[in-house]
Each structure stands twice: as C-alpha cells, then as structure tokens.
C-alpha cells in the first residue's frame, strides 16, 4: 500500500517496573515492538520508529532483527526531542535541532500516514489496512468500553468525531463517556504539515498531544472518520498484568492457528507455544507441553509436559517429561521420559529414559540404555561424541568426550568409556566384582559392637 507507518516507541514505561524497555518485553518469545513492526511491514515499505528512552538498546535489537528491512530502506529511526517536545504530538516533530522546522513532521515517502503505538502487540495488518483504505483525511480508531478508565475519551455526534479529551484533562461529565481513543490514526500528510506546528503544551501534563491535530482539523471543518475496532486487537500493554493478558490472547491465536493446520492438541489451554514455532504434517501435542524459539515439529507426537527449545523434531515421539534443548535435531527417533538432549542430532535412535545426550551425533539403529550420559564438558570446553549405526549402549554408561564410536558396537552396562571404539567391538570398563563370604553379617556385627562400647 502507498502508506507510511509511524510507530511510537519513545515512552519510559514506568508502570512495567523494569529496567528492560517496555517495548522489548516479550510475548510468546517475541518482543512486543516486533509484532507492531511485522504487521506494519506487511502493508508498507516505509516504516518509521520513534525512540527516546533507552533508544540505543532498542535500536541495537531492531538492527539485529530487521537488518534486511533497514538495508532496503523500509525501516527508519527517529529520536524524539523529548526534552523540548514531549508527548505523542512531540514524537512526530523534528525537534529543536531542526531550527525553524522544529515542530514540523518528519519526511515520509507517502502522503497517507498511519500512526500506531509500539505497545500494541495484538493489532493485525488486516485492521490497519481497513484504516488506510478509508478515504477520509483523518481516520481514527475508536473502542466502545464498559470500563473506559485510562483511555482518552472520544466525543461523537451522529457517528462523527467532534474532539478527543485525554483522561487527565477530562471533566467529571466527560469521564462518563464510553467511546475511547484506541490510539491508532491515519492522517493525510497535508493535515500534519498544517496543524502539527500549531500544537501547544498548555495542558496538565505539559505535553504536545497528537489528539490536538485532530481538534484543529475539526475546528477547520475537516471531518474525522471513526473506525470502531476490537478491544482485543488494540489493547495497550503498560503493566506486567496487561503483559500477561496480551500473552494469553496471543497464545490462543497461536494454538488455533496450529489446530487449523491439522495439529491435535490435548487440553490446548495448558500448551505454551512461542510465535516462531512451526508445524507440518500430522502432529499430536499433549497437555503441559512447551515449544520455544524457532522450533519445527513435523509428523511427531510430543507427549505430556515435555519442553522443546529451538529444535527440529521429525517423525518422532518425544516424552513424556523430556527436555529437547537448543540445536537438537531429532528424526525417526523414540525419546522417552526424563531424557535431555542439547546440540545433538539423533537419526533413527531409541533413547528410552533417564539419559543426557549433549553435543553428540547418533546414527540409525542405535539403542541408548537408561542412565547414559555424554560427558561433554571438561571444565573449559565442550567436546563431541559420535556414535555410528546399530550401536547398543548399556545402562549407566558414561561416554567421556571427545569420543568416536563406530558402527555395530556393544558397550556393557556400567562402563566408563574414555577411548574410541572400532567397528564391531565389545567395550567393557568395570572394576572386577568381589563377593565376600558372610560380609553382610560381619559388617553389621562390627556396627553392633561399636554401639555396645558407646
């Protein structure tokens, strides 16, 4: 679309009570601001982010995540002159460094300007598109709420916006109004050019309000179109409570999307998914499962209370109570309860229970017994274990990396393996067992004598 998008992300977010910038708090594994940017980039190739508080931290994160969009000129950054021009209107002004143009808007590629907030992670591009398709010179989003506390009130007559009043400046009678400003606008560039420089800060907060642009336009006979929107989409996140509420809504969206793609979910409200998780084929996800990061699950069964982090699971069953940690690739494999993997590739393997497999590669047909551990860390560095095809590793075996175990190898239970094993070998590493005649009676007889002496 031929529209420029401005995302306001300059606020301090003090109600979050956190050293982390408000817009970088995560919802389903993704920064709040990233949701707004992603939806904006779906409809525009000219997106502007206005920053101030902790702007270096936010900008660094954005440049890392949106390197290509920035290189292509689709993403731009502006630093608000907060000292001289605070507020939502001030966020659109060039600031004191621009001299005579201090209160003029920034330069945009298109005539239609869509303005939204960086703390609205639930807004959808389709709704933004609806705002932009309205031909009015000013279109604003309006919510009808039973409890409008915290929002600016919208005074309307016959469906037409008359003015907007910030809550802190509202009279008692105006606080009863249920129509509120959802905070997203589409404004023609000519309106901003004309009325933004007229905005002052003679209000209780001594801030420059974007809503005053709407007021001046209305005073000069320009009709303000209102688009009623859903509260769920336009919910602002200003506190940890609102953050949790937004995450619940996002989680439900992610679950429904997965189920629409054919995923079976047992007790879906107990399942946690992050935003970059993908599925393909027929999958079953049981209750209490967490799937995090850029994980991909294909034709697999993830059993109850398992955790999958940043990994690929293909044609496998995992769990219950398994932990697949980052950089694991599990294919055609059975992983049972209390098995943990990390940075490992398993192809056609059986790992029944109670094992840790880190920094290893195991080939098809191999069986890993209970209690097997790859000892991959020597206190200074990680080392790799490689296990070939059709290897049988007995229970309670410690594999001291670096280690190469070739195919068709048998390792006896209880062994500590420190050397490579060649094709077809049997490896044993145990202290010889001794059975001491009547040792039980002698041991406890000595204990009883000690008690008598005391």
Curated annotation (Swiss-Prot):
Top-level EC class: transferase
Regions crossing the membrane: none
UniProt-annotated binding residues for Mg(2+): 119, 238
Residues noted as binding UDP-N-acetyl-alpha-D-glucosamine in the record, renumbered to the chain: 8-11, 22, 87-88, 152, 166, 181, 238, 325, 342, 356, 367
Keywords (A to Z) from UniProt: Acyltransferase, Cell shape, Cell wall biogenesis/degradation, Cytoplasm, Magnesium, Metal-binding, Multifunctional enzyme, Nucleotidyltransferase, Peptidoglycan synthesis, Repeat, Transferase
One GO process term, biological-process aspect: lipid A biosynthetic process
Chain residue ranges for the region called Pyrophosphorylase: 1-240
GO cellular component terms attached to this protein's record: cytoplasm; membrane
Family designation: In the N-terminal section; belongs to the N-acetylglucosamine-1-phosphate uridyltransferase family.
Cofactor(s) required, per the database record: Mg(2+)
Region (N-acetyltransferase): 262-454
Spans annotated as Linker: 241-261
Entry's EC annotation: 2.7.7.23, 2.3.1.157
Annotated compartments: Cytoplasm
Cofactor note: Binds 1 Mg(2+) ion per subunit.
Source taxon at top rank: Bacteria
Reported function: Catalyzes the last two sequential reactions in the de novo biosynthetic pathway for UDP-N-acetylglucosamine (UDP-GlcNAc). The C-terminal domain catalyzes the transfer of acetyl group from acetyl coenzyme A to glucosamine-1-phosphate (GlcN-1-P) to produce N-acetylglucosamine-1-phosphate (GlcNAc-1-P), which is converted into UDP-GlcNAc by the transfer of uridine 5-monophosphate (from uridine 5-triphosphate), a reaction catalyzed by the N-terminal domain.
Binding site for acetyl-CoA: 370, 376-377, 395, 413, 430
One Pfam family from the record: NTP_transf_3
Name recorded for this polypeptide: Bifunctional protein GlmU
GO molecular function, one term: magnesium ion binding
Reactions that this protein is recorded to catalyse: alpha-D-glucosamine 1-phosphate + acetyl-CoA = N-acetyl-alpha-D-glucosamine 1-phosphate + CoA + H(+); N-acetyl-alpha-D-glucosamine 1-phosphate + UTP + H(+) = UDP-N-acetyl-alpha-D-glucosamine + diphosphate
Pathway where it operates: Nucleotide-sugar biosynthesis; UDP-N-acetyl-alpha-D-glucosamine biosynthesis; N-acetyl-alpha-D-glucosamine 1-phosphate from alpha-D-glucosamine 6-phosphate (route II): step 2/2; Nucleotide-sugar biosynthesis; UDP-N-acetyl-alpha-D-glucosamine biosynthesis; UDP-N-acetyl-alpha-D-glucosamine from N-acetyl-alpha-D-glucosamine 1-phosphate: step 1/1; Bacterial outer membrane biogenesis; LPS lipid A biosynthesis
InterPro entries: Bifunctional_GlmU (IPR005882), GlmU-like (IPR050065), GlmU_C_LbH (IPR038009), Hexapep_transf_CS (IPR018357), MobA-like_NTP_Trfase (IPR025877), Nucleotide-diphossugar_trans (IPR029044), Trimer_LpxA-like_sf (IPR011004)
Stored CDD domains: GT2_GlmU_N_bac (cd02540), LbH_GlmU_C (cd03353)
Annotated organism of origin: Helicobacter hepaticus (strain ATCC 51449 / 3B1)
Active site: 353
């Amino acid at each position: 679309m031929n529209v420029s998008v401005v995302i306001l992300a300059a606020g301090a977010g003090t109600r979050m009570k956190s050293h982390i910038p408000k817009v970088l708090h995560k919802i389903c594994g993704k920064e709040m601001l990233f949701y707004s940017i992603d939806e904006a980039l779906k409809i525009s190739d000219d997106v502007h982010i206005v920053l101030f508080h902790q702007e270096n931290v936010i900008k660094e994160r954005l440049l890392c995540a949106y390197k290509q969009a920035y290189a292509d000129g689709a993403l731009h950054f502006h630093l608000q002159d907060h000292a001289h021009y605070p507020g939502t209107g001030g966020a659109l002004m060039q600031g004191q460094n621009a001299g005579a143009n201090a209160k003029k808007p920034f330069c945009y590629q298109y005539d239609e300007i869509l303005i939204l907030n960086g703390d609205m992670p639930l807004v959808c591009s389709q709704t933004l598109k609806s705002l932009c398709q309205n031909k009015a010179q000013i279109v604003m989003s309006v919510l009808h709420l039973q409890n409008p506390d915290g929002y600016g009130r919208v005074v309307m007559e016959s469906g037409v916006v008359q003015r907007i009043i910030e809550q802190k400046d509202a009279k008692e009678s105006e606080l009863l109004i249920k129509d509120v400003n959802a905070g997203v606008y589409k404004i023609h560039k000519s309106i901003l050019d004309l009325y933004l420089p007229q905005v002052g800060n003679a209000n209780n907060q001594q801030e420059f309000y974007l809503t005053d642009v709407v007021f001046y336009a209305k005073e000069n006979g320009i009709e303000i179109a209102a688009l009623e929107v859903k509260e769920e989409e336009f919910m602002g996140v200003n506190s940890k409570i609102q953050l949790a509420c937004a995450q619940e809504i996002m989680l439900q969206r992610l679950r429904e999307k997965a189920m629409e793609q054919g995923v079976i979910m047992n007790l879906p409200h107990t399942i946690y998914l992050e935003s970059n998780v993908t599925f393909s084929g027929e999958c079953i996800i049981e209750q209490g499962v967490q799937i995090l990061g850029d994980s991909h699950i294909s034709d697999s069964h993830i059993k109850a209370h398992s955790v999958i982090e940043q990994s690929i699971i293909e044609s496998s069953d995992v769990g219950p109570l398994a932990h697949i940690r980052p950089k694991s690739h599990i294919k055609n494999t059975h992983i049972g309860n209390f098995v943990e993997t990390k940075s490992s590739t398993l192809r056609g393997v059986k790992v029944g229970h109670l094992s840790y497999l880190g920094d290893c590669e195991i080939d098809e047909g191999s069986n890993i017994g209970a209690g097997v551990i790859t000892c991959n860390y020597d206190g200074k560095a990680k080392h790799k274990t490689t296990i070939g095809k059709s290897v049988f590793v007995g229970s309670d075996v410690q594999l001291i990396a670096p280690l190469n175990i070739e195919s068709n190898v048998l390792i006896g239970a209880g062994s500590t393996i420190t050397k490579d094993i060649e094709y077809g070998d049997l490896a044993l590493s145990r202290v010889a067992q001794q059975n001491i005649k009547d040792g039980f009676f002698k041991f406890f007889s000595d204990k009883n004598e000690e008690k008598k002496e005391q």
